[in-house]
Amino acid sequence: MPLMLVYPAIDPVLVWLGPLPIRWYALAYIAGLLLGWAYARRLAAQPVLWGRRTPPSALEVDDLLVYAAMGVIIGGRLGYVVFYNADFYLEHPLESLSLWKGGMSFHGGLIGTALTIGLLAWRRSIPLAVLTDLAAAAVPIGLCLGRIANFIKPELWGRVADPDFVPFAMVFPGAGSLPRHPSQLYEAFFEGIVLFVILFIAIRLGALRRPGLVTGLFALGYGLARIGCEFFREPDAQLGFLFGGATMGMLLSLPLVLIGLFLVIRAASPKLETA
């Protein structure tokens, strides 16, 4: 019998405070926002990284946290409702408010955050690219923690894998008896750790001096990482494969790749150098 890893079966509830469950899933969102905020504050406090650009003040970074949190929660939920299960929520509209039952979309959260950051930029008269570059640098932190929470829950598991070739395949509770790719951990690594390192190095090499470059690198990097990981992730049961083996995650990530590529090419123009 081929060897395979045993799913650790971590309780999705970290602790009960009376009748209130404190779940890893919720803590991942909170920790992602707070750690991202702390990292953004650190970047904003280093003017040398920004060249002639004016970085946000500490108060503006605090505002960015609040606006980003609203965008993530509202956009993430609406994105899941619209992109992944519209038929169900049209029949049961009140269920769209049941956040505790799960169901969030990264792409929806990204759209929501882009809108709320745009609102903040307009209200505070801050160049939009200053805020998006700062936010993009911090997002991989939350992505990594969120994917680990998906693994603990467990949800969004991978496709069936042959343990002879994938020795780290495992059987997930609720996913049948066959071993599967731990695709949540693939995404935590590539969308979180690898992307964070790429952006960290780019920033140290002067990426924040070029408006939109960090934003573009994030969009391009995330889009490519997500499309790659989708080949190992089980499609959502209510959607399945859409056409030609494509999944909803792939289709939603393709525009990110194109937008990211455009922003990177645009930011590389000598006219945008602000060193």
Curated annotation (Swiss-Prot):
UniProt xrefs under InterPro entries: Lgt (IPR001640)
Q: Topology versus the membrane, per the UniProt entry?
A: Multi-pass membrane protein
Which EC number(s) does the record attach to this protein?
Answer: 2.5.1.145
Q: From the record, give the transmembrane residue ranges.
A: 64-84, 102-122, 126-146, 188-208, 212-232, 245-265
The biological processes this protein is annotated with in GO are:
lipoprotein biosynthetic process
EC class, as a word, reads transferase
Keyword entries, A-Z: Cell inner membrane, Cell membrane, Membrane, Transferase, Transmembrane, Transmembrane helix
Annotated Gene Ontology cellular components are:
plasma membrane
The organism's superkingdom is given as Bacteria
Subcellular location per UniProt equals: Cell inner membrane
4Fe-4S among keywords: no
Task: Say what the protein does.
Answer: Catalyzes the transfer of the diacylglyceryl group from phosphatidylglycerol to the sulfhydryl group of the N-terminal cysteine of a prolipoprotein, the first step in the formation of mature lipoproteins.
- What is the similarity comment for this entry? Belongs to the Lgt family.
Name listed for the protein in its UniProt record: Phosphatidylglycerol--prolipoprotein diacylglyceryl transferase
Native species: Beijerinckia indica subsp. indica (strain ATCC 9039 / DSM 1715 / NCIMB 8712)
Q: Which gene encodes it?
A: lgt
